Amino acid sequence: MPRSQNKDNFLDKAFTKMAEGIVKVMPIDSKEKEAYLYYRKGLAAQNDGDYSEALEYYEESLKLEDNQVDRGETLKNMAIIYMSNGDEERALNTYKKALGQNPKQPSCLKNMGLIYEKRGRMAQRNGNQDECDIWFDQAAEVWSKAVRLYPGGYLDIENWLKTTGRGNVDVYL
């Protein structure tokens, strides 16, 4: 393991332990505390590359978590794992669930657009311009929303929207 990654893992584990201690003394009910601890364990496992363990912890967190913003964050992390594992359809469905819990997650929209844009490029390579346009239009739709939520945060996407002519001028800074 590279030295910098080892240091990052140490810091993440130290932060996780510290967060667990803080959560134990916070004046919130035990269900919320337990949901947060499962979430943190899922995040630590995800950072360590243990995706199956991370998904198990995230599932447990979702069973306990009532806060929609927190549920949206957990679902987003699950979708990232599915996307990393190449399960694009499950990733898209999970991103949509995450946005249903918290529609103000530009990274979900960005990642959905990445999947749509990839599919469009594949259709283009296969000579299917109509299918390519459908996928690119879907990418433009979600990316335009992401740029509106996070102006200046996705310059590469803003550039893609401009150069393909699929974005509205009002989305840019």
From Swiss-Prot:
| One BP term from GO | photosynthesis
Give membrane topology per the record: Peripheral membrane protein
Where in the cell is the protein located? Cellular thylakoid membrane
Q: Per the record, a Pfam family?
A: TPR_12
Q: Which InterPro entries match?
A: PSI_Ycf3_assembly, TPR-like_helical_dom_sf, TPR_rpt, Ycf3/AcsC/BcsC/TPR_MFPF
Q: Which pairs of Cys residues are joined through disulfide bonds in the record?
A: none
Query: What exactly does this protein do?
Result: Essential for the assembly of the photosystem I (PSI) complex. May act as a chaperone-like factor to guide the assembly of the PSI subunits.
Its name, as the record gives it, is Photosystem I assembly protein Ycf3
* Classification lineage: Bacteria, Bacillati, Cyanobacteriota, Cyanophyceae, Synechococcales
Gene that encodes it: ycf3
